[in-house]
Amino acid sequence: MNTLVIVLIAAVVLVAAYALYGRWLAKTWGIDPKAQTPAVKYNDGKDFVPANGGTGCSHQFSSLAGAGPVTGASQAAAFGWLPVLLWVLLGGVFFGAVTDFGALYASVKNDGKSMGMLIEKYIGKLGRKLFLLFCWLFCLIVIAAFADMVAGTFNAYTVVDGVTQLADAAQTNGAAGMVSIMFMVFAVVFGLVQKKLNLSGWKEAVLGILCIVASFAVGMNCPLIFGKATWSYITFVYIFFAAVLPMWLLKQPRDYMTTFMFICMIAGAVVGLLVAHPTMNLPVFTGFNNEKLGTMFPILFVTVACGAVSGFHSLVSSGTSSKTVENEKDMLKVGYGAMILESLLAVLALCVAGAAAAADGTPAAGTPFQIFSRGVAGFFEMFGVPNYAATVFMTMCVSALALTSLDAVARIARMSFQELFSVDDMAHAEPWRKLLCNTYFSTVLTLVLGYVLTKIGYSNIWPLFGSANQLLSALVLITLCVFLKVTGRSNKMLFPPLVIMLCVTFTALVQRLMAMVSAIQNAAAVTIPAGETTWGAVFIANGLQLIIAVLLIVLGATIVVNSMRSYVASKHNSEAKV
C-alpha cells in the first residue's frame, strides 16, 4: 500500500477528532476563558510561568515526543502495520488525548496541583503516597532508558573484535552532540532575552530560529568525539540543571526551539512521503503471536506506548504544563492537541519504517531511531540538503526527542519525591524531612539512582517501561473518574479506556515478571556490561527489574483498590446530595 494514503487517512482522522471529539470534551466538562489560571494566580517566575497557547503547546509536545512514538510504532510493526495504525488512531483519539487533556484540565481547575496532590484531594492521603512512590519509580526507569539511549546516539566509538575504535558515524554523532550542547547554551540566551524584552509572535520566532542556526553552525564545525560514558555524564549534568533551574530560563526556551526542529522533521517526513510516496513494504498483518515479542494482547498495546496512550504524559500535563496555561481556552490545544500531534508522529515513524523495509517485508537493519533518522535524512537529500547536514540534523532531532522528555521527567521525579515527604508545615518539619525535600538533594538522589539503572541498558529496560507507563495511565484515569464524579461532570467516556488499560497493563506486567523469574532461574544469556559474570549479569538485567516490577504491581493494585473504594463512596455521596 502507498504510505501517502496511510498518512493522509491518519491526518484526516486526527484533525477531525480534535475538531469534533476534543471540542465536545471541552464543552462537556466546561471551559471558562475568564477564569484566572494557576499560572497567572501564582506566577513565581520558576514553576508557575504564564505562557500563550502556542508556547504551551510546544512545551507539551516537546516534552511528550520522546522515544516512544518512534520506537514503539516501529517495534510493534512486527505484528503488521495495520494493527499498529488502528491502535495509534483509536488509542490516540479516545485514550491518550482524553487522558492528557483530562489531567491538564483537573490540574488547572485545582490550582495547578500535580496528580499526586489531586489523588490526595479526591482519593485520600494513602493513595497519594502510593501514587507518588509509583511515579518516582517509574521516572527512574524513564531516566535510565532515555539517558542510555541519548549517550548511545552521540557515542563516537565502537568495539570491533574486542578493540575500541572510531565508528563510521563518529563525525556525525560528535557534531550532533556538540549541537545539542550549544542548543542548551543558546536556550539560556533565548530565555534571558525573552525575559528582558518580553518578545512574542514573529519576534519570538525569529529569535528562536537564530538560536537554532547558531547552535548548528557551531556544532557542525566543532564535533565532540567522546565515548558513551562521557556522553552519559554530560547528559546527567544537563538533566540536573533542567530539573532545578526556573522553567523560563532553560526548559521553556529549549522546548520552544525544539518545536521548530520537530516541525521541520515532521514536515520533511510528510513532504518526502508526498513526493516519493514509497510503498509500505511491511506486511499488513503477521498474526496474533510473534516469536520475538509474544502475543498481540497485551504486547502490541504496551509496545506502541506513547504513540497511543501514555501515563507519563499525564505527569507532564499536571506537573508542568498546567502551571504555564495562561487561559483556560488554551487547555484543549495544549492537552488534546499535543497528543494528536504525537499520534501523527507515530504514524510517520511507522510509514518511514515501512518504506525502509525490503520488498519481501524484511525490516531494515538498525534501531528504530536509526531507521527513522536515515529515512527522513534521505527525504531531505531529495531537496538538495547535503548528506552530512541532513544526517546531523536528524541525529540531533531524534536525540532531542529523548532529551525533551528527560528534562521533563527529571523535574517531575524531583517534584514527586519532594511531595512524597513534604508536610503542610515544612518550616517546623524534622531535619531529615527538610533534607529529603530539598530541591538539590532530591534531584541528585534521583539522578544517581537513575544513572545506576542505566547499567541495565536501554534494550533490557524498555519492556518494563512500556508496561509501567500504561499502568500509570490507568491510575490517572481512575483519578479523573473520581474528580469528574465529585465535581458533577460526566465521566462515562473514561470507563472504556480505564477497563481496557487495566487489563492490558496488569497482564503485561505479570508476563514480564514471569519472564524475568524464568531468566534468573535458567541463568539466561542477556546483553550485559563487559566484565560481568553470568549470574551477576542476569541479576543486573533481570533481578533489579524484577524487584521494580513487583513493587509496581503491588503499588498499582493497591492504588486501584483504594481508588475504587473512593469512587464508590463519592458516587454514594453524590446520589445522597441529589
Predicted regions span which residues?
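Transmembrane helix-loop junctions in multi-pass membrane proteins
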Residues: 2, 70, 82, 141-166, ...
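Extracellular loop-to-transmembrane helix junctions
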Residues: 2-19, 76-107, 116, 175-187, ...
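Membrane-interface loop-to-helix entry segments
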Residues: 16-30, 134, 174-218, 228-275, ...
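Membrane-interface "cap" regions at the ends of multi-pass membrane proteins
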Residues: 16-70, 259, 295, 299
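Flexible loop linkers connecting adjacent transmembrane helices
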Residues: 23-49, 72-75, 85, 89, ...
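Membrane-helix boundary/coupling elements in multi-pass transport proteins
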Residues: 67-74, 91-99, 103, 107-111, ...
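Extracellular/periplasmic helix-exit of transmembrane alpha-helices
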Residues: 101, 273-287, 340-375
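Loop-to-transmembrane helix boundary motifs in multi-pass membrane proteins
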Residues: 125-140, 337-343, 390, 419-455
